[in-house]
Design a protein with these regions (language model features):
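Short gly/pro/ser/thr-enriched loop/turn and capping motifs at secondary-structure boundaries
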Residues: 8-9, 155-159, 179-180
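Rossmann-fold NAD(P)-binding glycine/threonine-rich loop
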Residues: 127-143, 151-172
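Structural alpha-beta junctions
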Residues: 20-21, 144-147
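Residue-level detector of anion-binding/catalytic polar loops
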Residues: 120, 147, 172
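Conserved anion/nucleotide-ligand pocket segment
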Residues: 2-5, 174-180
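N-terminal glycine-/serine-/threonine-rich beta1-alpha1-beta2 phosphate-ribose binding loop
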Residues: 1-139
Length: 180
């Protein structure tokens, strides 16, 4: 959603580090193996965006679509994952409104897509300031029975309310803010 798009880096990083040796110290990667999971255990099964230039494209193509201008450090092969129309809420701020056009049509049925794709964890990389949109996606994750990684500085995992909701549902939640 923004010029320095964490989702682009994440998608490229999974490709770039997929064969990393867990026994080595790898620059740019804190842990090759985290809790028994290797980078190559990450599989993309669904993707959501609101930009008309990205919706409908394969994820591998959409990540390099304007206004994203993140440095390309890995060639992401075609993934067979069509970007679906996401929910906007407050995810399109004043700055982004000048750069992208919201995709037409209704929001995809996020819960059903997460269920149909047998998603385990929803990783949320919305633009900073998208508090309402993040909370909406949190609700979708809980309804679909999937874990949630909040990469934004919006208090979700650290809030008793959300923590309790995830515990009650027996789901993991990680966050808040990818840098924390």
């Amino acid at each position: 959603h923004n010029d320095k798009d964490g989702a682009v880096d994440f998608t490229q990083g999974v490709e770039y580090y997929k064969n990393a040796d867990p026994g080595e110290s790898i620059p740019g990667l804190m842990h090759v193996d985290l809790g028994g999971y290797h980078v190559n255990d990450i599989e993309f099964v669904a993707a959501f965006d609101i930009d008309q230039e990205k919706v409908g494209k394969d994820l591998s193509e959409a990540i390099y679509t304007y206004p994203n201008n993140t440095y390309k450090f890995a060639d992401v092969p075609k993934l067979g994952i069509e970007v679906q129309r996401g929910m906007t809420h407050d995810g399109l701020g004043k700055y982004l409104k000048q750069k992208i056009t919201k995709a037409p049509g209704p929001t995809a049925d996020i819960v059903q897509i997460l269920k149909d794709t047998r998603t385990d964890v929803l990783v949320c990389y919305l633009p900073v300031g998208s508090e309402d949109a993040v909370k909406w996606y949190v609700e979708q994750a809980i309804a679909a029975g999937v874990g949630f990684v909040n990469c934004l500085p919006v208090f979700i995992a650290s809030e008793d309310y959300w923590d309790g909701r995830f515990k009650e549902a027996g789901l993991p939640i990680i966050g808040d803010d990818i840098k924390s």
